[in-house]
């Protein structure tokens, strides 16, 4: 029986390499394989990470190819193209959907049944593409969803209330994009409702979603891209996939009836374990949050419909 390993498609890029580095630092898996069209760059990233592990090495990082994928391996896909000046979002979706289809075809070519974790953007739509192209069960294909958005919000609230971010219980849900929304109305710090927490002021949470987005935009403006935060998110997800503890993160996977949604992929509270992903049904949402969820789902559904029509033309 093959030992489970992590393979990162796009491992030569900053997101893929940083995800590999985070996984290696945290020792979440023993073998990491970087796959990239630029084989020299992938080799350099793998060598650099291995050198970092030299003093206390319990993880091996190396380059490889699609034929290295076996049943139950974890394949993280970070490859894709960024949005160009003047390019519409639908045009970007068309380009990255083609890239995703080609990657998934290569992944599935040897008949293995891995887990697919999508990081490439727009992550909700590309997760749908990967699921459809792979033919894998829906519990084996999911994206990072709004996990990074949630991490940003928890970091912001932890600073505002001067608490450990682990004490903050709140999510950003929906699209990993401009229609995302927070569950701030039912948020808690420890087990205390946020509005009852000592020192609470309404301005602390007013417009929290926009503040989270502006934080992301500011990071991109100053350093062109984000990779440390999403790399760490990937390491947490990979770790959860290797355990039976059913860790909850707002990843994106196919909804089939949950929260009244069908045939749409977006960030929802979900359990992740060695059994894969499962949407956590029944998470309490306010009426405002339900409206926001349906609005976000509608936006993603239109993008999915656009892709389905384009593919059938």
Question: Predicted segments — roles?
Answer:
Residues 2-6:
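Extreme N-terminal starter segment of soluble prokaryotic enzymes
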Residues 12:
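Conserved glycine-rich cofactor-binding loop
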Residues 16-17:
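N-terminal Rossmann-fold NAD(P) dinucleotide-binding loop
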Residues 29-33:
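Short beta-strand element of Class I
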Residues 35-72, 87, 301-308:
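Conserved N-terminal Rossmann-fold NAD(P) cofactor-binding segment
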Residues 54-115:
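Rossmann-like NAD(P)-binding element
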Residues 89-154:
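Rossmann-like NAD(P)(H) cofactor-binding subdomain of soluble oxidoreductases
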Residues 134-140, 149-313:
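C-terminal substrate-binding/catalytic lobe of Rossmann-fold NAD(P)-dependent dehydrogenases
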